[in-house]
Amino acid sequence: MKKSLIEKLQCPASKSKLLLLYSHDEIEDDIVSGLLASNSSNKYYYPVVNGIPRILSNSLQTFQSAVEEYIENLDANDQELIRNSFILDKKLKKDVL
C-alpha cells in the first residue's frame, strides 16, 4: 500500500480518517504490513497485510496472528483495546457455537 493512499482512507464504522498507527515492513514508499486506526474517540483498528489495507469490520480478528507480531510496539492503551477485541471475538464465537 502506498503511503499516499492513507490520506484517502476512511473508517467504515466511524467515518473518520484512518491514521497509520504502526508500520512493520516498508519498502521505499510502500507499507507491507502495519496497523491503521480510526481518528475518532471510539478507535477501530485495521491491519495492513501483504501491502493490502484490510478495512472490514472483522479484519482485526481475521488477521489476528499478523497483528500479534507487532502489538508490543504499540502504546499500552492501543494494546489493551486490541487485546480486548480479540477476547470479545472469542467470547462471541463461543456463545454462538
Description of each model-found segment:
Residues 2-97:
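Conserved N-terminal segment of class I S-adenosyl-L-methionine
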